[in-house]
């Protein structure tokens, strides 16, 4: 296919037009008085959102050169979202400011390579200073503040703070759509896996259709149980002790299943069988997790163990087990705490080594089940459109909170970026490197300027006053007051601000050093005409 090529100034100007179109659509959402953007959907109702990365991903421009510029800034938003989970609008605003200022200087004769070195030098100093003014997050109130600022909703802040307190830093918090109007929190205590009873006749509560076992023995195996004779010796030992039993196996079927159900209905003993969770190697790992949690052993041929020789000592125990048709929950497993923490550390090490995002997610789930817990935030709203928008905001808030726990917090509302202005301005350089530093300095002001602009105020006046205020003091655009941002709970996670600055500078520096852009030429003939299917002689059809 023929290519269209643009060079130097033409190329950079075309890309800047694309950058501006995307950034202008995204930056209206910044700050407490930011607006929403409506996105057309081919199917269903439009999506109304103020999430920067969601808007950026939707934008496709007709001109291929402009589209390339837009896609570069979209990547800034996506990368920031991947690393920190929030701050995508801030990253877009920073990138636009750096690109605009940079192109002005390159057009005026500055050397792009020198400018790039200046940008990199300034950003490195800015990140060091951000870390220096960062404060660790300690209390539940601080967590609630971070989540409330990100989502723009205090109730969401409290909900996420409670979820994180209940499940801990190793826990998993998932966000689901609720059937009702209210947004609520559901926390699963203990280890839960998505396998239910193999027969409904095993339930102990026929109203709720669930089986509740108090202080049961737990047989864990990766084998199929077809013949009751295989587990009869260990069953007899459990019956003698008068305690219920949970069997976790690859499957329980045929004569074994029938015998267990019959004895359960007769009241001889209380037993529930469930299928083992997961598949393949993941199943083996999850069974081992259950064994460690309950203080039992996995009866498997890999270890030379057989069901018919199993004893009560090899079974796990727990305070309580609840089994429904879909899930099994083990509460307060009786495993040794040192073995559990060793297993947790082993999973953490695997998480650090793996390069697969899917594997990391599954390892995180296993870690949560062993060390923390699982919390589900059920999002409710009056309409589907509001539900989607609310869900996106809560996801942002959750990501922000995790980032804050990881690297601490700085003053919000763009204040932190202006607080480090003087330290970056003190860098010594000359020529084009100095120009690069000045480009970063100008961009550090831009988030505050945009937040003020969205609130209907003059951004430059706010920025100038902010430069002379004490560290941490900033402008609250929600009510127009000058306050200590951290004391007022207007905070941003350090990781979010850092990622936004790093990713924006990376793409800006690359775009400034671009000298040629190559794109496909549009097909002037348009799509090929559909051939006549020879249906002309069928005029008599009704």
UniProtKB/Swiss-Prot annotation:
Keywords: ATP-binding, Chaperone, Cytoplasm, Isomerase, Nucleotide-binding
Localization: Cytoplasm
Documented EC number(s): 5.6.1.7
A molecular function GO annotation: isomerase activity
Principal localisation: cytoplasm
Family that this chain belongs to: Belongs to the chaperonin (HSP60) family.
Function statement: Together with its co-chaperonin GroES, plays an essential role in assisting protein folding. The GroEL-GroES system forms a nano-cage that allows encapsulation of the non-native substrate proteins and provides a physical environment optimized to promote and accelerate protein folding.
HAMAP family: CH60
Name this polypeptide is given: Chaperonin GroEL
Gene it is expressed from: groEL
């Amino acid at each position: 296919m023929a290519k269209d090529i643009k060079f130097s100034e033409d190329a950079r100007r075309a890309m800047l037009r694309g950058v501006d179109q995307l950034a202008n659509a995204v930056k209206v959402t910044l700050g407490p008085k930011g607006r929403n953007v409506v996105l057309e959907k081919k199917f269903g109702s439009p999506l109304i959102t103020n999430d920067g990365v969601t808007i950026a991903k939707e934008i496709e421009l007709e001109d291929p050169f402009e589209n390339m510029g837009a896609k570069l800034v979209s990547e800034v938003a996506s990368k920031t979202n991947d690393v920190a989970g929030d701050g995508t609008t801030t990253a877009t605003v920073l990138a636009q400011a750096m690109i605009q200022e940079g192109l002005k200087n390159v057009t005026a004769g500055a050397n792009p390579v020198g400018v790039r070195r200046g940008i990199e030098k300034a950003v490195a100093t800015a990140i060091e200073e951000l870390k220096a003014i960062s404060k660790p997050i300690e209390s539940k109130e601080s967590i609630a503040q971070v989540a409330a600022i990100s989502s723009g909703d205090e109730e969401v802040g409290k909900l996420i703070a409670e979820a994180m307190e209940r499940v801990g830093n190793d826990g998993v918090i998932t966000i689901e759509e609720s059937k009702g109007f209210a947004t609520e929190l559901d926390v699963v205590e203990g280890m839960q896996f998505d396998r239910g009873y193999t027969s409904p006749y095993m339930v102990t509560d026929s109203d709720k259709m669930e089986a509740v076992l108090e202080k049961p023995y737990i047989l864990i195996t990766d084998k199929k149980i077809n013949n009751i004779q295989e587990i009869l010796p260990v069953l007899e030992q459990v019956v003698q002790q008068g305690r219920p039993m949970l069997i976790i196996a690859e499957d329980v079927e045929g004569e074994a299943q029938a015998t267990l159900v019959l004895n359960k209905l007769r009241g001889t003993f209380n037993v529930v069988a469930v299928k083992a969770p997961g598949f393949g190697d993941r199943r083996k790992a999850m069974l081992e997790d259950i064994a460690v949690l309950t203080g039992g052993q996995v009866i498997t041929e890999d270890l030379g163990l057989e069901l018919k020789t199993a004893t009560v000592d090899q079974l796990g125990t727990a305070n309580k087990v609840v089994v429904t048709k879909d899930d099994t929950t083990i509460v307060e497993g009786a495993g040794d705490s040192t073995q559990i923490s060793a297993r947790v550390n082993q999973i953490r090490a695997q998480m650090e080594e793996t390069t697969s995002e899917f594997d990391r997610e599954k390892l995180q789930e296993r870690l949560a089940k062993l060390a923390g817990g699982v919390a589900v935030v059920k999002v409710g709203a009056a309409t589907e459109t509001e539900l989607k928008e609310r869900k996106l905001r809560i996801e942002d808030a959750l990501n922000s909170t995790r980032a804050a726990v990881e690297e601490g917090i700085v003053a919000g509302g763009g204040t932190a970026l202006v607080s480090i202005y003087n330290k970056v301005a003190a860098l010594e350089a000359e020529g084009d490197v100095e120009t690069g530093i000045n480009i970063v300095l100008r961009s550090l002001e831009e988030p505050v300027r945009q937040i003020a602009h969205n609130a209907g105020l003059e951004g430059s006046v706010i920025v100038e006053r902010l430069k002379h205020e004490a560290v941490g003091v900033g402008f609250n655009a929600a009510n127009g007051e000058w306050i200590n941002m951290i004391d007022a709970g207007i905070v941003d996670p350090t990781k979010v601000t850092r990622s936004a600055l790093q990713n924006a500078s990376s793409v800006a520096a690359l775009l400034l050093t671009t000298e040629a852009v190559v794109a496909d030429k549009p097909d002037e003939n348009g799509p090929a005409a559909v051939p006549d299917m020879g249906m002309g002689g069928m005029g008599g059809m009704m």
